[in-house]
Swiss-Prot record:
Stored Pfam families: RRF (PF01765)
Function summary: Responsible for the release of ribosomes from messenger RNA at the termination of protein biosynthesis. May increase the efficiency of translation by recycling ribosomes from one round of translation to another.
Subcellular location: Cytoplasm
Native organism taxonomy: Bacteria, Pseudomonadati, Pseudomonadota, Alphaproteobacteria, Hyphomicrobiales
Record keywords, A-Z: Cytoplasm, Protein biosynthesis
Similarity-based family: Belongs to the RRF family.
MF GO annotations: ribosomal large subunit binding
NCBIfam families: frr
GO cellular component terms given for this protein: cytosol
Protein name: Ribosome-recycling factor
């Protein structure tokens, strides 16, 4: 937001950033169903640097509860296998040549409830981030109006727009959480 003006698109972009972070965090929750994004946080020591798994291998989902990791460089297979074992995801790869197969174990009801709580925590953090963006926007609007660069009518109109954008983003967060909760609890 620049001085003297108010950039609503920047405000919405920042709010959507919070939703994007939430989706990334929820994508990393293991739900008992195979998903290629489950392995996104894993990095491998390769070629003298830490690299994401998707830069040294292809991850696919051949079955609902099976991940397949096709490592491109034969010399990297053991490093990829070690990184997956050390990832705290509870996955145990079976290696067949350059392909690692990962069976996704069933989740018990207690673990599902724990995952739902974690998902709620992530969603609440996203809502707090959106509220911070709203507060920044409202503070900026009040400052611009106080400096005489905006009428009180414009302030009221833009304040309502900021609140509407906030409400829409919070609703999107709630919808994303509800989808993930349903996915976690479905057996």
């Amino acid at each position: 937001m620049t001085t003297g003006t108010f950039d609503m698109s920047d405000l919405k972009r920042r709010m959507q950033g919070a939703v994007g972070v939430l989706r990334d965090e929820l994508g990393g929750l293991r739900t008992g169903r195979a998903s290629a994004s489950l392995l996104d946080p894993i990095t491998i020591e390769a070629y003298g640097a830490r690299m994401p798994l998707n830069q040294v291998a292809t991850v696919s989902v051949p079955e609902a509860r099976l991940l397949s990791v096709q490592v491109w460089d034969r010399g990297m297979v053991s490093a990829v296998e070690k990184a997956i074992r050390d990832s705290n995801l509870g996955l145990n790869p079976n290696t067949e040549g350059q392909v690692l197969r990962l069976r996704i174990p069933e989740l018990n009801q207690e673990r599902r409830q724990e995952l739902v709580k974690v998902a709620h925590k992530y969603a609440e953090a996203a809502k707090v981030a959106v509220r911070h963006v709203r507060r920044d926007g409202m503070d900026h609007l009040k400052k611009v109006e106080k400096d005489g660069e905006m009428s009180s009518d414009d302030l009221d109109r833009l304040s309502k727009d900021v609140q509407k954008a906030t409400d829409e983003t919070i609703a999107e967060i709630d919808q994303t959480l509800a989808q993930k909760e349903k996915e976690i609890l479905s057996v």
